[in-house]
């Protein structure tokens, strides 16, 4: 997490000058125990410290700022706040990395590993051997963690002692000599005095290729940080009580020194986020091996640009440059804002010199750590091979023991199976005998049942044949009787058909005669023609017909009478309705005439009243128009006089502003010339590179790395 910093403070940084005291370690929750750490220092500093040209901070907001450095800061204690709980990103303190470097321990070796990872690395191991290796690894990891925590406490005590103890003159002279030798060493290389030397990683990679185990532990190369974050002395003194909280950062760091040695140093890269670390070993520092703090006395202190730019030496240096510019150019005083910019430029130059010293010490320490790491890897490989051989022998002994036990169990099982087989054979023979007896009994019983069934079937067959014979005889007799009845019925039908044909012919003749003589005579002839078969029914039908005819005649007469009565009533109703309609129309005509007369009278009255109102409104409008015209003329006169007065005031104000602007422009030009000469003087003394030059150097380094 990053402290919020105003834009004015961010604008005061030159490219590559935001120093870093923190490294960000990304530890995913599902990859605890993995040997490949995530890329560090990529999320906190890469986005916060982008190189850009210097922008002057606002002098008016200078009084309300914090007492810390004006640059962007990383908070060493922000993982104690509630907002950081459950975050995947943990800030790793540089003290933790320094403690790991002193103890020759890689921070990734302090991470816990799962038992499944050890089993996955060596599929041939048994679970007992893997469990033993896991317990040994955990014990070694806890010992290393305790050792690194103790070393970190010792580093914190040394830093506190240095913070409150001024440097001796001898130490100051040694630091100045180292600062003087660093630029000369840097200028002999292909880059400028402020650029970094190339890392010896390619040479180390050509000397010894990594073993399979070490290749697994090497993390992917982390992206170089574009800026440096410095923890100010004031913030450190205020928060020294909560320094113990960074132990979690040491245990969750994903830092690896070998991955950084495999990269070339980009220009102005941080020296704090590339602290060397050894491989997995719990040995402490050798008595003759120098640490980073013993090589360079100043590396134990944590500086920021705010600390360097507010120091008395920087203030005296800036004052001397200002006096020199006044004497040479004869200009007026330099503003406080430009003085702060000059002090910041000098502080950056001092910080670069300090970082050069730290890098030189780190490169020497890295070379020594590489040799020790190679020896430790070889020793660990031998120990792993020895443990693997022991595991194989134990596994072979267990296999032999299991094989003998399995043979005994198989022989015992064979004997049990033999006894069971013999018992089953006896039971099978007894069962076979019983089944044979049962089969013979069933066969005899089935034979008896078959004989009885055959006898019964023969009897049933005889009875069925006799029944069939009787049925055939009865059927033949019935068929003959049916044929006789059919013949008689056919004869009767033929006689009936002939009679019907004769009757039909007579009926046709009678119908033809009835058409000529009339319906009454036709009905009488039909009754005479059908009297042989329908005499009784025809009489009733005739009676019914006569009754129906009479009833129909009566109904027709009644209906005709009702229709005539309804016709007379409808005619009377129509005449009455016509008379009523005629009277209604006459009444409507009279009412319409009355309404028309009333409407004509009302319209005439409305026209007269409207004419009177129009005349009155015209007179009122004429009076209002004359009053408005007089008012507009008066307003125009007032506005014209006010406009003339305002134009006069504006002309006077414009002349005054022109005079003030001319004087302010002259003053600003004089101040700008003084500020320019002060900055040029500071650049000449510090030989600071420009942003374009840094871009060209970065492109050159990138092309050399690709080659």
UniProtKB/Swiss-Prot annotation:
Pfam annotation, one family: DUF4659
Sequence ranges of Basic and acidic residues compositional bias: 377-392, 399-426, 454-484, 491-514, 543-581, 618-637, 652-664, 677-707
Region (Disordered): 1-65, 183-294, 372-426, 454-581, 597-637, 652-707
Residues found modified as Phosphoserine: 311
Residues in coiled coil: 364-605
Disulfide bond annotation, renumbered to this chain: none
Ranges annotated as biased composition (Low complexity): 38-49, 183-215, 243-258, 665-675
InterPro entries on file: DUF4659
Keywords, ordered alphabetically: Coiled coil, Phosphoprotein
Domain of life, source organism: Eukaryota
Protein name as catalogued: Coiled-coil domain-containing protein 177
